[in-house]
Amino acid sequence: MKRKRAIIQHILSEKRRIEKIKEGDSMAGKDDFGTTKYIIYAEFEANGVVERPDVVGAIFGQTEGLLGDDLDLRELQKTGRIGRIKVEVHTKAGKSYGTILVPSSLDRVETAIIAAALETIDRVGPCEAKIRVVKIEDVRASKRKYIIERAKEILETLIEEEIPETQELVEEVRKAVREMELIEYGPEKLPAGPHVPFSDSIIVVEGRADVLNLLRHGIKNAIAVEGTSIPETIIKLSKERIVTAFTDGDRGGELILKELLQVADIDYVARAPEGKEVEELTKKEIIKALRSKVPAEEVYNELFNKGKSFYEIVKEREGKVKEEKPEKEVQQPKPQVKANEKIVKPLPVPKQDYRGFEEFVERVKNSQDPIALLLDENKNVIAEVHTRDLLSAIDENDGVYAVIFNGIITQRLIDVVSEKGVRYLIGAKKANVVRRPVTLKVITFAE
């Protein structure tokens, strides 16, 4: 009876041992060098005939509890930190030889500890054995080498193909977003940029495509006339804002420009290069055209009275700039004044300028947003507000001595500030000013 019990216990223990070996082998199949950082290469020699399961079982069995729970091989395999252990066995003259490969995603120190632990194994199955670590390979170095070689091959195949640069891709996305910013303005639902409702200056173009092109290049204060008949919204805006007419460089653009100059209060005129349309201009061409804008009064006079084209006017202006070179000052002899002769100097004509407010004028000019400054008599800033909130700010603050803002001085604004006792009103431009109180000095930046 005792013998039977001993045989059964032996069979059960052997069964458990085989199951452990199988479990270790199946766990080893979870990782196939996918996230491996290092590979431990080892060689073994056993004084007898052994098989692969014997070697795997020895590795798991004899290192169990040796390095603590954190570096236990079974736990490391369950969490994927140790990969599938590969073993090759060869038998010769009653002895077994082979190699062991252990993939590791641990760090260098922990991998070295695991490698050293393998060398403590002294038995494989029933036989004495010896394991020696040959090397630890850094898989990432091999991957880097592969990446370099493969990248060279890919580059050779793509070298002749046009690959968009990152900047081009970014610009494409920006353009798509800007196109979504298009709004409809006024009763006529004119295509316009998002800044048209509150911007002090606007650009009037011919059609929707022109507004879209300007939007793509970051210009958000454009509005289209949409046809040869100028809408009432454009006429009304021209009386309240600083308006630049920006038309195509063809016959149609010239006709629309003439109509705009006749029915609207245009301040500046810009044209696309001859033969080109605004909708097809590049950013560089748009900026160059807008920088070369000509005052509307000059264009009106030359266009209607002298019959010159816009481009002739621009060429003449450029020619005048080249001719106006600084000449050397010729020293003229000073007139001799007799002892009894009186020197009569002309009395200076008083100019209405913004002396004493230069610092504040530059401040509003250089601001990214249109702002207004409210000053007291000692030139201290009482309030700094957006130009659209100027009227309410004047109404809410007492003791305002001067108002300086980057916007258009209108009759309504003059009436409001004069009622509050303001002495100085300084702005970018005047528009339709009919009456001006004696106590109020109205000054533009140009003055």
UniProtKB/Swiss-Prot annotation:
SMART domains this protein is in? TOPRIM (SM00493)
Which cofactors does this protein require?
Answer: Mg(2+)
Sites where the protein binds Mg(2+) 1: 206, 248
What EC numbers are recorded for this enzyme? 2.7.7.101
- Provide the residue positions that the database annotates as binding Mg(2+) 2: 248, 250
Catalyzed chemical reaction(s): ssDNA + n NTP = ssDNA/pppN(pN)n-1 hybrid + (n-1) diphosphate
Keyword list, A-Z = DNA replication, DNA-directed RNA polymerase, Exosome, Magnesium, Metal-binding, Nucleotidyltransferase, Primosome, Transcription, Transferase
**In the record's cofactor note, how is the cofactor described as bound?**
Binds two Mg(2+) per subunit.
Q: What does this protein do?
A: RNA polymerase that catalyzes the synthesis of short RNA molecules used as primers for DNA polymerase during DNA replication. Also part of the exosome, which is a complex involved in RNA degradation. Acts as a poly(A)-binding protein that enhances the interaction between heteromeric, adenine-rich transcripts and the exosome.
**Stored PANTHER family:** DNA PRIMASE (PTHR30313:SF2)
Q: Which family does it belong to?
A: Belongs to the archaeal DnaG primase family.
Protein name as annotated? DNA primase DnaG
Q: Which organism is it from?
A: Pyrococcus abyssi (strain GE5 / Orsay)
Lineage at the top is:
Archaea, Methanobacteriati, Methanobacteriota, Thermococci, Thermococcales
